[in-house]
Amino acid sequence: MATVNEYRQHIQNLLTERAKLVWDDRIQAQTIFDTERDHYQLVYVGWRGSKRLYGTVLHLDIIDRKIWIQQDGTEIGIANQLVELGVPKEDIVLGFDPPKMRHYTDFAIG
């Protein structure tokens, strides 16, 4: 059984690796790790010409020993990456899905 500390490390590693994939040098990928309250985010900040770019790409929380994915703007899906690292599906909640729809997935309901 994985520990919360392992979950923290997995999340931080995945967000750090994802931050290296910025496609434009005018865009900053910022990782935000609140390890006391278990909130983790990857945010893009910058400008493309006169257009402001700002957005949360990934937002994960650890709540009651489960990983809650609040936002996932990736194609591969961070839930799949967590499973590949050995995190059981019953410890991952797709928080961006409505609660009444979560039982249709292989992941935790909440």
Q: What kind of feature is each model-predicted range?
A:
Residues 1-110:
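Terminal domain-initiation and capping elements
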